[in-house]
Amino acid sequence: MKEGTKEEMEGKFSKAKGEIKESAGEMTGDIEMEAKGEAEKRKGEAQEKVGKIRKEFEK
């Protein structure tokens, strides 16, 4: 698997994981979990974008 594709997939996974944590934090009133989930989601979004850019350069 090419690096760009791998990076993009890992980013999507981190984004999804962060969204779940963020939602769980909202439902339980756990502000710390909500913040950590949002941070992980943002990191995943950035990683996904980096993967897409790498894929363009791998062509």
Curated annotation (Swiss-Prot):
Residues 1-59 are annotated as: Disordered. Pfam families: CsbD. Residues 1-24, 33-59 have a biased composition (Basic and acidic residues). InterPro entries: CsbD, YjbJ_sf. Coiled coil: none annotated. It comes from the Archaea. Belongs to the UPF0337 (CsbD) family. This is UPF0337 protein MM_2677. The lineage of its organism: Archaea, Methanobacteriati, Methanobacteriota, Stenosarchaea group, Methanomicrobia.
